[in-house]
Amino acid sequence: MNEKQKLESGQVHPSDKKSEKDYSKYFEAVYIPPSLKDAKKRGKEAVTYHNDFKISEQFKGLGDGRKFYIRTYGCQMNEHDTEVMAGIFMALGYEATNSVDDANVILLNTCAIRENAENKVFGELGHLKALKKNNPDLILGVCGCMSQEESVVNRILKKHPFVDMIFGTHNIHRLPELLSEAYLSKEMVVEVWSKEGDVIENLPKVRNGKIKGWVNIMYGCDKFCTYCIVPYTRGKERSRRPEDIIQEVRRLASEGYKEITLLGQNVNAYGKDFEDMTYGLGDLMDELRKIDIPRIRFTTSHPRDFDDRLIEVLAKGGNLLDHIHLPVQSGSSEVLKLMARKYDRERYMELVRKIKEAMPNASLTTDIIVGFPNETDEQFEETLSLYREVEFDSAYTFIYSPREGTPAAKMKDNVPMRVKKERLQRLNALVNEISAKKMKEYEGKVVEVLVEGESKNNPDILAGYTEKSKLVNFKGPKEAIGKIVRVKIQQAKTWSLDGEMVGEAIEVK
């Protein structure tokens, strides 16, 4: 009698205790722990493009009468992966729910970029244990970047055996098969591919709203910064074909979307893996700017791949926004070398000069890590001086977080946590100071705002973002939601602007 027959006969319940299954085969067959040496060999394998994704007839109706809930941690790529998984769930017949208490399936789409992100997930698993105990039929899964780390999978196997399924970033398209296996088996379903996946087109999506849309243009990263786990969790760089991207953007434009963001772990390396043509992000954006959609952004950039062609195209303006996120990570050339960023302070500043020369009003934001192993006071001061020199509009700032399997995690570190926290406080004070100064310049000006909805703090106030991604709160009619309207700024705060709508609720774009 197989597992399905046992379930149907009532002899086995899907919540029965997991068996002492030997999981070693998964790691020998489809899972390899992060290895810089092994990962750098991966470029020899060709990427295959699949345009024929569809839900198998045997899985249709799998979700009838069932609800799903996905909790997402981390970056925009994860947000978009969640949209894809939601699309697959809906195609299987599931209904979405905003409550874990109502869900028949709960997925945690995880982030591995920092230890704090992982701690949040393990904390959430602890909370969900009681829910699983009270509802044994609940399917609980962990997916995303954390699942690509062998240490994480081992921890789940040992300490959270109530989890039903674990899968990674490369096999999201196999969600129907994994769900079916989870229902039919009393054992934990583990399928984590260390080999980066192929490029799968035609995946269903349930997008979050009808105003702004994410569009993946590439996957993975080949840069291997010494502190970063992403090349291991997301695989090698793989670009979608331009015709598929253009078709998707045109479809979003026809559906009324006002803004799209092109996504990639290293978005401006787009096209470098093409063997049949020379075609980069600048070429793609030069085609996308002709599509009737008001705003086009991209993230995240690596300074190493930000070329003159891209600057030339961005300078054409129009619907290509001059808000550029350009992570510097450190202002010290010595630290940048230890990070394996492959540029120094001077090269970064030269890139900033080129951008500002071509686009004088460009808005630059960045990422900065403080407390990298053995960072000296002088090296940290170089970061502060670079920040003052560039005058970034804002920055995401972090204390260095060791990631197991990365070269930096093996470095000796003589910087006490107390010093790292002090440096972060000093950096954040500078970030706030310059942000407040730049926001003050908006007072009295009229800006175009894409209205996204009601303010989180006041339902009588509308909220939206400018082309340079500044949050604007203002009074206006609900009909303005989803439109781009003019707002006169009356008061500037450190991280937001308050204003009033100019004229009637007439869309300007």
Swiss-Prot record:
Cofactor(s) demanded: [4Fe-4S] cluster
A biological process term (GO) from this entry: tRNA methylthiolation
Residues that bind [4Fe-4S] cluster 2: C221, C225, C228
Single GO term (MF): N6-isopentenyladenosine methylthiotransferase activity
Disulfide bonds: none
UniProt keywords, alphabetically: 4Fe-4S, Cytoplasm, Iron, Iron-sulfur, Metal-binding, S-adenosyl-L-methionine, Transferase, tRNA processing
Iron-sulfur among keywords: yes
Top EC category: transferase
The reaction(s) this protein catalyses: N(6)-dimethylallyladenosine(37) in tRNA + (sulfur carrier)-SH + AH2 + 2 S-adenosyl-L-methionine = 2-methylsulfanyl-N(6)-dimethylallyladenosine(37) in tRNA + (sulfur carrier)-H + 5'-deoxyadenosine + L-methionine + A + S-adenosyl-L-homocysteine + 2 H(+); N(6)-dimethylallyladenosine(37) in tRNA + (sulfur carrier)-SH + AH2 + S-adenosyl-L-methionine = 2-thio-N(6)-dimethylallyladenosine(37) in tRNA + (sulfur carrier)-H + 5'-deoxyadenosine + L-methionine + A + H(+); 2-thio-N(6)-dimethylallyladenosine(37) in tRNA + S-adenosyl-L-methionine = 2-methylsulfanyl-N(6)-dimethylallyladenosine(37) in tRNA + S-adenosyl-L-homocysteine + H(+)
Enzyme Commission number: 2.8.4.3
SMART domains found in the cross-reference section: Elp3
Domain MTTase N-terminal: 66-184
Domain of life from the UniProt record: Bacteria
Region (Disordered): 1-21
Residue ranges constituting the Radical SAM core domain according to the UniProt record: 207-437
Keyword Iron: yes
Family matches, as CDD domains: Radical_SAM (cd01335)
Stated family: Belongs to the methylthiotransferase family. MiaB subfamily.
UniProt-listed HAMAP family: tRNA_metthiotr_MiaB (MF_01864)
Protein name: tRNA-2-methylthio-N(6)-dimethylallyladenosine synthase
Annotated organism of origin: Bacillus subtilis (strain 168)
Organism lineage string: Bacteria, Bacillati, Bacillota, Bacilli, Bacillales
